[in-house]
């Protein structure tokens, strides 16, 4: 009997023994860094001469892993492997596939601290964020395993005299998973194993910055007994293999989390029917946001300031749900801005090995992009705090607040994906909602208000996929807050929802006359 779903707990680092144990795990992981990461195709580990490096963004001289690069020939072999494995994997019962995923989750639970420690080094994640990432990966796997069991018998439809009808679900084939670097375990594991538990096979192209983290999942899948070829591991240069994976005639679906530019490119290319392709491809895309916290008058200003700061600067603003815009009623704007500045100036920034609140941004490209937006912000508004940058040893950017901005300003319209938040002063709640919707994106949002009628207005008019009342706009929890957005934030395929597996299933109807 499968026990009811329960979210995986984090680790309480206010307890000294937990701190000591995690420090020991960091030492163990650090001693093993620099290893070679192979491709994995049909269960075979392939080490290539053409490689790239994964480095610690907090200490760029520290090699995390030397990664083999997949070629287009390797991708062809991976598709052959996945297509072959699909013929038997799709015949596994729903229950057997789900139980295998539960074994995977149990192994991850046993290795949670190891996986978390790897993310501290490879992704520059603070301790709590790293542990939360690993725990969320467990949650996704546990949740999807149970979801598959619930879908096993299909859904009831009507019979009539002399006719029995069945409506049930079947897998669709081989697909491609392209996960992001910012949740290198949780999103990677969830978007890989959701289609797998549904009976499909996958080519997993991990994010280049966090390959070691993704490779740990491959080790765990092998230990759990996943058949060879069900998941094939193909790290590589997106410019060399990205389009090839998406365009391939055997790609039935692409699940992608990342930038708007890449997501729309995938969507466009997936619409082209290739020679020999007998189906329409599905795209499941999450492409970021320009998320806002709206603050009404007559609110708890301490709560509002804390919600803005934690949502803006957690994991250095490198969350698609991060608060990038603070839209504040004129009656409380100055007070909340001042409190937010004070809270921000207390945040610690540094190498997350030392358990700082904030660590580096992920790579040089992101560092340069964010630094450029800070310069733009200085021209468009007033720099209130932060703005400093340092890439001498790692990619560090101070938590930065701008005020005096207008909705049309670039730093209020374009996704920065870093520790930068802009304040806009509005005259009333109607204007606040108007400004909040003045964006191409619609992922998350929050409203701080004590006016029930204003909250109802936000529910009906604030055009985001995930809306929160009197809290920040980050930290969706699997099973409680299915996650996905509107507009240019993606296809709104809510992860961690009862409907998510339907993205990887076809519905079949069988009518039997008697």
UniProtKB/Swiss-Prot annotation:
Name recorded for this polypeptide: 1-pyrroline-5-carboxylate dehydrogenase
Keywords: NAD, Oxidoreductase
GO biological process: glutamate biosynthetic process; proline catabolic process to glutamate
Pathway involvement of the protein, from the record: Amino-acid degradation; L-proline degradation into L-glutamate; L-glutamate from L-proline: step 2/2
Residues annotated as the enzyme's active site: 286, 320
Gene Ontology MF terms in the entry: 1-pyrroline-5-carboxylate dehydrogenase activity
Keyword Nucleus annotated: no
Pfam families, sorted: Aldedh
Catalysed reactions listed for this entry: L-glutamate 5-semialdehyde + NAD(+) + H2O = L-glutamate + NADH + 2 H(+)
Homology family: Belongs to the aldehyde dehydrogenase family. RocA subfamily.
Any single GO CC term annotated in Swiss-Prot or TrEMBL for this entry: cytoplasmic side of plasma membrane
Record bears the keyword Heme: no
Gene behind this protein: rocA
Database matches in InterPro entries: Ald_DH/histidinol_DH, Ald_DH_C, Ald_DH_CS_CYS, Ald_DH_CS_GLU, Ald_DH_N, Aldehyde_DH_dom, Proline_metab_enzyme, RocA
EC numbers on record: 1.2.1.88
Alphabetized CDD domains for the sequence: ALDH_PutA-P5CDH-RocA
Organism: Staphylococcus epidermidis (strain ATCC 35984 / DSM 28319 / BCRC 17069 / CCUG 31568 / BM 3577 / RP62A)
């Amino acid at each position: 009997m499968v026990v009811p779903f329960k979210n995986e707990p984090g680790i309480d680092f206010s307890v000294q023994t937990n701190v000591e144990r995690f420090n020991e795990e960091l030492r163990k992981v650090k001693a093993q860094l620099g290893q070679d990461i192979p491709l994995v195709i049909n269960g075979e580990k392939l080490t290539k001469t053409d490689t790239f490096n994964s480095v610690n963004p907090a200490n760029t001289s520290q090699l995390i892993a030397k990664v083999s690069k997949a070629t287009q020939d390797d991708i062809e072999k991976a598709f052959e492997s996945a297509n072959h494995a699909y013929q038997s994997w799709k015949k596994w019962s729903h229950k057997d596939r789900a139980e295998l995923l539960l074994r995977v989750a149990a192994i991850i639970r046993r290795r949670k601290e190891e996986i978390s420690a790897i993310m501290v080094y490879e992704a520059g994640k603070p301790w709590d964020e790293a542990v939360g990432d690993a725990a969320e990966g467990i949650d996704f796997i546990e949740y999807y395993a149970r979801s598959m069991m619930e879908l096993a018998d299909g859904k009831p439809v009507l019979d009539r005299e002399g006719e029995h009808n069945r409506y049930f679900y079947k897998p669709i084939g081989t697909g491609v998973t392209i996960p992001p670097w910012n949740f290198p375990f949780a999103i990677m594991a969830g978007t890989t194993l959701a289609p797998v538990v549904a009976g499909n096979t996958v080519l997993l192209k991990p994010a280049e910055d966090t390959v070691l983290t993704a490779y740990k999942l491959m080790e765990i899948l092998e230990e759990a007994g996943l058949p060879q070829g069900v998941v094939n591991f193909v790290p590589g240069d997106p410019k060399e293999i990205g389009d090839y994976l998406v365009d391939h005639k055997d790609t039935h679906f692409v699940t992608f989390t990342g930038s708007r530019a890449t997501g729309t490119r995938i969507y466009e290319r997936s619409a082209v029917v290739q020679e020999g392709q007998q189906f329409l491809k599905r795209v499941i895309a999450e492409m970021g946001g320009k998320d806002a916290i709206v603050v009404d008058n007559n609110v708890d200003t301490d709560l509002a300031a804390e919600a803005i700061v934690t949502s803006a600067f957690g994991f250095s603003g490198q969350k698609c749900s991060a608060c990038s815009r603070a839209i504040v009623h004129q009656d409380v704007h100055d007070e909340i801005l001042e409190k937010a500045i004070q809270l921000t100036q207390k945040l610690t920034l540094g190498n997350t090995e030392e358990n700082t609140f904030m660590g580096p941004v992920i790579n040089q490209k992101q560092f340069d992009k964010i630094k450029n937006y800070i310069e733009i912000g200085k021209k468009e508004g007033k720099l209130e705090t932060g703005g400093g940058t340092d890439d001498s040893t790692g990619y560090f950017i101070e938590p930065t607040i701008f005020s005096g901005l207008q909705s049309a300003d670039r730093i209020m319209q374009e996704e920065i994906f870093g520790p930068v938040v802009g304040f806009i002063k509005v005259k009333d709640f109607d204007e606040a909602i108007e400004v909040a919707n003045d964006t191409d994106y619609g992922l998350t949002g929050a409203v701080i208000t004590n006016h029930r009628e204003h909250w109802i207005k936000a529910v009906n008019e604030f055009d985001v996929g995930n809306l929160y009342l009197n809290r920040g706009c980050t930290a969706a929890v699997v099973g409680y807050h299915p996650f996905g957005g509107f507009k240019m934030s993606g296809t709104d395929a809510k992860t961690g929802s009862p409907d998510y597996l339907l993205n990887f299933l076809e519905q079949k109807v069988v009518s039997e006359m008697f």
